[in-house]
Amino acid sequence: MTIYFVAGEVSADNHGAALMRSLRRLDPELKFIGRGGPQMQQIAGAQFKNWIGDAAVLGLWEVLRKYGYFREQFRQTLSEIQESKPDAVVLIDYPGFNLRLARALRRQSQIQKTIYYISPQVWAWNRGRIKKMARFIDLVLCIFPFETDLYAASGLHAVFVGHPMIERLETQKIETYRDQNLIGLFPGSRSREVRKIFPVMIEAARRLLQLNPTLRFQVAAASEQLADQMRKMVAPHLDPLPSGRGEAKVETEPNESLDQRSASSKGKVKMQVAPNESSHQAPLPLSRGEERVRGPKGPLPHPIEIAVGQTAAMMQHAFVGIVASGTAALEAAYFGMPFVLIYKVAWPTYVAARLVVNVDFLGMPNLLAAKEVAPEFIQHEAKPDAIAKAVRLLMEDSLARHRMISDFDAIISKLGGTGASERSAQAILEELKEGRSPGRPGGVETAAPWSTR
């Protein structure tokens, strides 16, 4: 049997690769084709297209700017599926592209099955689309327990499989400690997202350093390319040494208030580059080009360090995090790292979203808890002073920290534990054997008796 996959984002590439491995364990003869990211391509082979770098965009405005590209990719994808005639198409998240593709495929009746893995969040912006989805999707694999209830009356076959993130993060647990001077910055996995959010994080870090020069900041980069982009964004905030030597400092006045410093220095904390110093205080391996500074109390890591591929380790070591809205928020909750959440996109995208989104919170931990567990700073509210104030509270108020961590534990317990990819693979193969078609009486299922529903 042949399965055609479509994944358009880094997180979908992670989940798609895990699903492919589980499918291969159940049926080694399966052939995988389609488009996704490097992890999926490594499993499927050279015929699988890696398009993540161009396909991963954030928001309506960004999509409109690349409309010609996406129109051509849509045409190519449809043509590839028509020519290869796979037994099933598995669409992973990426609803703007994948829902249109599913509808187009059903019109042409070119494939046996259309399966949607990681349900599109239509419950947030257009619940009326659920009934329409039932006309062209055979099976939806849901990662949140409340989603299956929304599909129950629609005729759309839905299975709660649990969140695939859990099995990946379970393997990334390490023995470490919470460094009370370390703050993690998680600006997202897309270039445009980083350009919008990382400057706000840098400014929040500046405010926090003004209050406590011993603080350290580590930034999670999804790739070396993003790390280079972040280094260039940090560079203007650094004061190069006149001598070009590898010694530097953070300059502050010990008895000066934040407001006084802001007035006298226009909000700037002077940071100078020291490329080659070492410190026993930095347990995480950092990316190439790591820089360090010398603070007033001796050697300290550079206030803003950039680490590639160290997100999980950083979330287990940082005392507090500043996190871009998205998958990283749930990851932070899983690892029990108190955090504040930032959402910032182009204004046309934000205005359009306000017109259609119908949820009380943007962060998934808050949605699952039905309350604001982690503070959210959205668009114009994402101001450095407000973010720094919220971070300080989580660093200094042990009760607030413990309450947040306890809420995180309750949230993660709803996600089904490990094995989501295996359960998803089983559900896909069962669907292929049973020969259902869209429009049949649907319902809610769970893939295993462990379900918390």
Sequence positions of predicted segments:
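Nucleotide-activated sugar donor-binding and catalytic core shared by glycosyltransferases
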Residues: M1-R453
